[in-house]
From Swiss-Prot:
Composition-biased stretches (Gly residues): 93-102
Originating organism: Vibrio parahaemolyticus serotype O3:K6 (strain RIMD 2210633)
Protein's name in the database: UPF0229 protein VP0986
Superkingdom classification of source: Bacteria
UniProt record similarity statement: Belongs to the UPF0229 family.
HAMAP family: UPF0229
Region Disordered, annotated ranges: 69-112
InterPro entries named among the record's database cross-references: UPF0229
Pfam families: DUF444
Length: 423
């Protein structure tokens, strides 16, 4: 069996390369596990990583081995009991079952525990928000958001095998062999010329001829011993993240805190907004976030008050939409900003106010918004607000609405709303 020895030097995190390779290879299984973990842990808990489990059958790695077919007899290293031709007895079972354990617990089947390992906080958030983006983000006059894109950045002497540059490595090999053998080849040529000259001299100088032959042989061995390629020659493609010009963006978070929103419904809304806030701050370096709470009256608040205030009251949803329109006109010129909004409510609204909300969206907000999402948190049948908003879905492609029934729906709905568009 062929054996491969990795002689490359690593830093203090000597397994970092292997870890990244493992995460890349089992990306889909890890994403599924992280998506399940979102519902188990508090979304605000981002100070720690996450334990990820992968079925044992999914982590089998490719190995180098002899091909199938043919007849081979082999004695494996470490064997001190058998010789070629011996047949090994079948192991005696420990019970009635065909499983891998002992005893009579199961009549059939076998299995292995899932492979469990921990990913770091950064890895957890990277996987959580992968393939998500703010829809329809356009470049405006003033760029403030910093997005990052991976670019080729020359070569480096360490890396993973998939990034190796064969041509550059062979160029380095040729340069090294030329540098290490040029002087020896020059001396070899001189000795060979000297040997030819001595052979043509009469009388023959046998001792000098033997000395030259010995030196020539030693030089040839030294030249042959220079390896064709060495780890010193290996060059790997280097990649780095560079900021790319992007645009200014503002996200309006509109949350219903009226009396009809019970504590469980408010908690779901807050979890959704925490997830949205983490996504924005993790993916984009500079995004303005405007928090608006509303019952019969709407008020712009800071982050702490948005998530922790206990204020409540009746329900007039249009008050929040009016306040958002005022803030846009005052602070966020449409020509310079990408405007986004995420509205969460239980759908309970004063009946005469729901048509007013639709008119505000049609005439004021949607023409100026890159994307507007409405999330209704309820297990009941939809009310007038949902039905009024439903009329907008065909007319405005930048408007989306989803229903969240329980905590388990938060992350799937979030991914649907902010899924990256495929080119």
């Amino acid at each position: 069996m062929a054996q491969f020895i990795d002689r490359r030097l690593n830093g203090k995190n000597k397994s970092a390369v292997n870890r990244q390779r493992f995460l890349k290879r089992h990306k889909e299984q890890i994403k599924e596990s992280v998506a399940d973990a979102v519902n188990r842990r508090s979304i605000t808990n981002t100070e720690t990583g996450e334990d990820v489990s992968i079925p044992h059958k999914d982590i089998n790695e490719p190995i180098f081995h002899q091909g199938k077919g043919g007849v081979r007899e082999r004695v494996h290293p470490g064997n001190d009991q058998f010789i070629t031709g011996d047949k090994i007895e079948r192991p005696k079972g420990g019970g009635q079952g065909s499983g891998s354990g002992e005893g009579n617990a199961s009549p059939d089947g076998e299995g292995q525990d899932e492979f469990v390992f921990q990913i770091s906080k950064d890895e957890y958030l990277d996987i959580l928000f992968e393939d998500l983006e703010l829809p329809n983000l356009e470049k405006n006059q003033i760029a403030k958001i910093t997005e990052w894109k991976t670019h080729r950045a020359g070569f480096q002497t360490a890396g993973i095998p998939s990034n190796i540059s064969v041509i550059r490595s062979l160029q380095q090999s040729l340069a090294r062999r030329t540098a290490m053998t040029a002087g020896k080849k020059r001396l070899l040529k001189e000795l060979e010329d000297e040997l030819t000259r001595i052979k043509n001299i009469e009388p023959a100088q046998q001792l000098e001829e033997n000395r030259l032959k010995k030196e020539i042989e030693e030089l040839r061995k030294k030249i042959e011993n220079v390896p064709f390629i060495d780890t010193f020659d290996l060059r790997f493609k280097n990649y780095e993240k560079r900021p790319v010009p992007s645009s200014q963006a503002v996200m309006f978070c509109l949350m219903d805190v009226s009396g009809s929103m019970d504590q469980a419904t408010k908690d779901i809304a807050k979890r959704f907004y925490v997830l949205l806030y983490l996504f924005l701050t993790r993916t984009y370096e500079n995004v303005d976030v405007v928090f608006i709470r509303h019952h019969t009256q709407a008020k712009e608040v800071d982050e702490h008050e948005f998530f922790y205030s206990q204020e409540t009251g009746g329900t007039i949803v249009s008050s929040a939409l009016k306040l958002m329109d005022e803030i846009v006109k005052e602070r966020y010129p449409v020509g310079q900003w990408n405007i986004y909004a995420a509205q969460a409510s239980d759908g309970d609204n004063w009946a005469d106010d729901s048509p007013r909300c639709r008119d505000l969206l049609v005439n004021k907000l949607l023409p100026n918004c890159q994307y507007y999402s409405y999330i209704e948190i309820t297990r009941r049948s939809h009310q007038t607000l949902w039905h009024e908003y439903e009329k907008l879905t065909d007319e405005f492609p930048n408007f989306a609405m989803k229903n969240i029934r329980s905590v388990e729906d938060i992350f799937p709905v979030f991914r649907e709303l902010f899924q990256k568009e495929t080119a």
